[in-house]
Regions:
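Short cysteine-rich clusters marking metal-coordination/redox-active sites
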Residues: 97-100, 118
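Interaction interfaces in information-processing and related assembly proteins
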Residues: 1-88, 128
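Glycine-centered tight-turn and secondary-structure capping sites
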Residues: 89-95
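Cys/His-rich microdomains that often coordinate metals
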Residues: 104, 125
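Short, flexible micro-motifs
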Residues: 62, 95-98
């Protein structure tokens, strides 16, 4: 009789841990870089404080800053998702679909390591 696999093995979880940690490191670096740009930590010039610059670039600058804030928020959410994935790995619940309780395919977890739903569950969830 076949037994249904209810969780990934410890070796598989360690493989996923390496993937998650790699993505987390990159995400944190990207977030830090975005925050540097937002807070002008990399510049020593006065170009963005001169009245001429402000008059000409106010709209563009405002839009760019809004986009950067949005990017930073998305990156922060991604980091939180990856940190939650690490907790699920520690708890040995990583890769289990939160709706069906079945294992999420490895291919999906490699592509989206913070996933908590299989593609099918996600589509069904959106339809409701």
């Amino acid at each position: 009789m076949d037994t249904i696999k209810r969780r990934y093995s410890d070796a598989e979880l360690e493989e996923f841990r390496a993937i998650v940690l790699g993505r987390l490191e990159t995400a944190k670096a990207d977030y830090a870089e975005t925050m540097k740009v937002l807070t002008n930590q990399d510049t020593n010039d006065v170009d963005d404080t001169s009245p001429t610059y402000k008059a000409l670039e106010e709209g563009s600058s405002s839009q760019t800053k809004e986009e950067l804030v949005h990017m930073a928020m998305r990156q922060q959410k991604f980091i939180q998702g990856l940190q939650a994935a690490l907790l699920r790995i520690d708890n040995k619940t990583y890769g289990i679909d939160r709706i069906t309780g079945e294992l999420i395919p490895k291919e999906r977890l490699r592509a989206v390591p913070h996933a908590t739903l299989s593609v099918q569950s996600k589509q069904n969830y959106k339809d409701h």
